Amino acid sequence: MLEQVILFTIIMGFLISVLISPILIPFLRRLKFGQSIREEGPKSHMKKSGTPTMGGVMIIVSIAITAIVMTQKFSHLSAEMFLLLFVTIGYGLLGFLDDYIKVVMKRNLGLTSKQKLIGQIIIAIVFYGVYHYCHFSTGIRVPGTHLSIDLGWGYFILVLFMLVGGSNAVNLTDGLDGLLSGTAAIAFGAFAILAWNQSQYDVAIFSVAVVGAVLGFLVFNAHPAKVFMGDTGSLALGGAIVTVAILTKLEILLVIIGGVFVIETLSVILQVISFKTTGKRIFKMSPLHHHYELVGWSEWRVVVTFWTAGLLLAVLGIYIEVWL
């Protein structure tokens, strides 16, 4: 029965995304919700200017419908599922506002860093308020063991850091056709397996719903992309994967399973530190995927390489938790 629920969930998530896309993409094009390409980015990306963005709407709709329907068939809407949907939709709405400012109000940078940070923190605080009210654990568990370290109120700081940092890290990865869609599918697939192993079936169903939704989106987002997810999708996915890690008490393992997102973020941080302190850049451009483009790799080669790295890291994460 449970295996059938998981199978139907991924199929449903995939089909909803695939069926929504042919309706939403022309609609976005008619509204002229096209992506603006920053001039300081790789010159090869200029031809992508005008490609419909805000496609993350179809991902969020697919996730929400699939997760709610399949959870109701299996049991009921739990506190875990509520928190997962709240963060996903909340961060998605924040990303939608950012995208709207970029494409409609023609402010290429969207929300200011301060505005986006305030929005991310508010959502994180509400999340933690519900999390604390439901008496969920404030401890972090060492992967592969039963050892848990209770952080008390320090866990609140960790949650804020993870949700803000994690959503931004995933957002940074969304720079090439299909890059984030593929890496997100792999990472959520790994968490689905681990949640299932913990008998956290609601979290597993949600994670599989995300896998189906992003794979359906990937049909239209693979190179050459017909639509971009925008911050609408990337912030939603970032918030979602952090929430999954928190609910499964795999906060530490997120660094490995989401290793591609971590590496992308570190490349930006190191680039800034190096330039500020020495006046020299470590990479030709950051995030890291742009560096490989500028050394001559094709976009597709970069994407497949990052997918492969993400898959290897996901397998490593599962191995540490289940078999180590």
UniProtKB/Swiss-Prot annotation:
Bilayer-spanning residue ranges: 5-25, 50-70, 77-97, 117-137, 147-167, 176-196, 203-223, 227-247, 250-270, 302-322
The processes (GO biological process) annotated in the record are: cell division; cell wall organization; peptidoglycan biosynthetic process; regulation of cell shape
Q: Which keywords fit this entry according to its UniProt record?
A: Cell cycle, Cell division, Cell membrane, Cell shape, Cell wall biogenesis/degradation, Magnesium, Membrane, Metal-binding, Peptidoglycan synthesis, Transferase, Transmembrane, Transmembrane helix
Keyword Cell cycle tagged: yes
**GO function terms (MF aspect):** metal ion binding; phospho-N-acetylmuramoyl-pentapeptide-transferase activity; UDP-N-acetylmuramoyl-L-alanyl-D-glutamyl-meso-2,6-diaminopimelyl-D-alanyl-D-alanine:undecaprenyl-phosphate transferase activity
What does the record give as EC number? 2.7.8.13
Q: Which HAMAP family match?
A: MraY
Protein task: Catalyzes the initial step of the lipid cycle reactions in the biosynthesis of the cell wall peptidoglycan: transfers peptidoglycan precursor phospho-MurNAc-pentapeptide from UDP-MurNAc-pentapeptide onto the lipid carrier undecaprenyl phosphate, yielding undecaprenyl-pyrophosphoryl-MurNAc-pentapeptide, known as lipid I.
Q: Which family does it belong to?
A: Belongs to the glycosyltransferase 4 family. MraY subfamily.
Identify this protein by name. Answer: Phospho-N-acetylmuramoyl-pentapeptide-transferase
Please spell out the taxonomic lineage of the organism that makes this protein. Answer: Bacteria, Bacillati, Bacillota, Bacilli, Bacillales
What gene, per UniProt, encodes this protein?
A: mraY
